[in-house]
Every structure is written in C-alpha cells, then in structure tokens.
UniProtKB/Swiss-Prot annotation:
Site (Cleavage) residue list: K225, A226, R231, K232, R234, V235
Record key words, sorted: Cell membrane, Cleavage on pair of basic residues, Cytoplasm, Developmental protein, Disulfide bond, Glycoprotein, Growth factor, Membrane, Mitogen, Nucleus, Secreted, Signal, Ubl conjugation
Domain CUB: 46-163
Cysteines joined through disulfide linkages: C104-C124, C250-C294, C280-C335, C287-C337
Recorded superkingdom: Eukaryota
Pfam family, one: PDGF
The species this protein was found in: Homo sapiens
Subunit structure: Homodimer; disulfide-linked. Interacts with PDGFRA homodimers, and with heterodimers formed by PDGFRA and PDGFRB. Interacts (via CUB domain) with PLAT (via kringle domain).
One MF term in the entry's GO annotations: platelet-derived growth factor receptor binding
Impact when changing R231A: Essential for cleavage by PLAT
One cellular component (GO) term of this entry: plasma membrane
Compartments (UniProt record): Cytoplasm, Cytosol; Secreted; Nucleus; Cytoplasmic granule
Protein name stated in the entry: Platelet-derived growth factor C
C-alpha cells in the first residue's frame, strides 16, 4: 500500500472516532437534560424522596406548559422532624385532562397517605383547584400519571410546608366532617339524599369519584350472595329503590322497613336506610272463619338478599369504611286470614 493511501485511511478512521465521540456526548447531554427536567422518577415502582425542612414545591414536567405524555412520576415528602405534618397547597394554575363520567381515569394527580395507603384525593380537569391536603404524619406521597393521549396545560404545581399539629385550626362542632358525627346523627343526615352520587360526594368531597369507582369495581373475593346465587342482578341502581305501595286485602304488599331495625344493628349505617319488602297487610273483613275477629298473617315466608351501601366507623382512626353488602330480609309470599289468637287457623 502506498504511503498516500495509508495516510488517507488513517485520517478517515480518526474522523469516524471523533464523530462517534461527538454523537455520544450529544446523546449524553440530551439524556441528562431529560432526566433533569422530569422533576421526579419515571419508574412507577420507585419514588423520589424529598426531605422537607422548609417550604418548597413540586410540579408536573414543563409546568406551566403542556406536560409530556406517557409519564408516571412519584414523590414522597418526608419531614425532618417526626412530630409534624406536611400541608399541600395547589397552585391556582391547575389543568389536566378532563375526567370521563366524573372519574379521573387518564391524566391525574393523586395524594396518598403512606402510613396506611389511603388515597386522600385524585384530581384532573380544570374546573376547580383542589383544596389543601394535610398528612396524618410526617410523610405524604404524590403521584402524577399521564397517558398517551390529550396532554393539557398548565399541569399542576403543589406547594408544601411544615404544619405543627398543636397550631392547626380546630374544627368547629357545627362543621364537623360527616365521618366525625355520631352514627345516629349521620344516619339522619344521609336520609336526605336521593342519589348515591350525592351521598358519596357529601361523605368524601375531595375523593368521591374514587370511592364511587371503587364501589362498582368487580372484586371476586367480595362478591355477595345476591351475585353468587343469582337472586338479583349484580348491577343495581341504588337510586331507584322506591316504588308505589299498592293496597290489597290480606295479600303480600309493599312495606318500607328500616334495615337497622330489622337487623338490630346500631353500629352500622345502611343506605338506602329503608327498603321495600313484601309483608302481609290489609284487612280480613270477609273472613270465612267463624270467629269474632280475623287477622292477616303470613303462611309462606322467604328470605331475599338486597345489595346496599354499608358505612362502618374505622377502628382507631377517623373515617368510615364504605362497601356494598347483601342484607337478608324476610318477605311474605302468601297470606291467610285466621282467627285472632288462633294457632290452628
């Protein structure tokens, strides 16, 4: 090979190495810029831990501009001192993808209590700015999720600060949250609601969409007797459990009964609080028995299951357990007129 050819080959190889190195440096630069911009972690199995000693803030990527798609970011705020709380305040500039059927399914930010996994709230859309959130201890977790469609702006920004428990505002007895009311008062309060949506919104103003979604999420471990035995459809419109009462003479007719009284449960609230059951009613004016007075009594009784919302106080902490449950109530299938006080009819 000539000396001239060898020089050309050496020059070409050197240029290729320089180009590769420049490309690698450029790639690393973009990667570093991208990682710095995320303001959190991309892997949903990990979280970015932020030590909180002074005021600060976290925000969606590119805030207040359109956030990126396909993003999952998790932050866990941990106060330096143990006996303090963390307060979150949302910036007035708030806008994520709109909910579907009033439920935040796609793009949302949610706040979780790390101690017990309770979701304090999930928010999306741009109609209202979420209210302040206060942790139960010295930690709180925030998660931001966006899917591959319709990113919005400006995203969100959450300001955090330390709150001393002894200096938090006391809740006035007149504005106690529903979960803090005695069961009897709460039972009276919820009877005024005609739809399940309004009831859940009253109980959990910040996270009612989540609770409503959880109630109707299929869970095989919790399927009730009404589902397994096919006594009624699993999908029940709890807003339409009222009907006209028709009067018959000693026949099964609709009666409204209090579930708490029927089951003798004073530790639990049910909604609806009353249900229609078949009970013998009417009169026996045309009684065929030769007696002074007849009465209408059941001759065939069965038990039927009704799916209702059950509210029970949580043990040791403030709040209510909410679940759909089946209650068994007596229904009179057939009725007869018998002499009052008679055992044989």
């Amino acid at each position: 090979m000539s000396l001239f050819g060898l020089l050309l080959l050496t020059s070409a190889l050197a240029g290729q190495r320089q180009g590769t190195q420049a490309e690698s440096n450029l790639s690393s630069k973009f990667q570093f810029s991208s990682n710095k911009e995320q303001n959190g972690v991309q892997d949903p199995q990990h979280e970015r831990i932020i030590t909180v000693s002074t005021n600060g803030s976290i925000h969606s990527p590119r805030f207040p501009h359109t956030y990126p798609r396909n993003t999952v970011l998790v932050w866990r705020l941990v106060a330096v001192e143990e006996n303090v709380w963390i307060q979150l305040t949302f910036d007035e500039r708030f806008g994520l993808e709109d909910p579907e059927d009033d439920i935040c399914k796609y793009d949302f930010v949610e706040v979780e209590e790390p101690s017990d996994g309770t979701i304090l709230g999930r928010w999306c859309g741009s109609g209202t700015v979420p209210g302040k959130q206060i942790s139960k201890g010295n930690q709180i977790r925030i998660r931001f999720v966006s899917d591959e469609y319709f990113p919005s702006e400006p995203g969100f920004c959450i300001h955090y600060n330390i709150v001393m428990p002894q200096f938090t505002e006391a809740v006035s007895p007149s504005v106690l949250p529903p979960s803090a009311l005695p069961l009897d008062l709460l039972n009276n309060a919820i009877t005024a609601f005609s739809t399940l949506e309004d009831l859940i919104r009253y109980l959990e103003p910040e996270r009612w969409q989540l609770d409503l979604e959880d109630l109707y999420r299929p869970t095989w471990q919790l399927l009730g007797k009404a589902f397994v035995f096919g006594r009624k459809s699993r999908v029940v419109d709890l807003n339409l459990l009222t009907e006209e009462v028709r009067l018959y003479s000693c026949t099964p007719r609709n009666f409204s009964v209090s579930i708490r009284e029927e089951l003798k449960r004073t530790d639990t609230i049910f909604w609806p609080g009353c249900l229609l059951v078949k009970r013998c009613g009417g009169n026996c004016a045309c009684c065929l028995h030769n007696c002074n007075e007849c009465q209408c009594v059941p001759s065939k009784v069965t038990k039927k299951y009704h799916e209702v919302l059950q509210l029970r106080p949580k043990t040791g902490v403030r709040g209510l357990h909410k679940s759909l449950t089946d209650v068994a109530l007596e229904h009179h299938e057939e009725c007869d007129c018998v002499c009052r006080g008679s055992t044989g009819g």
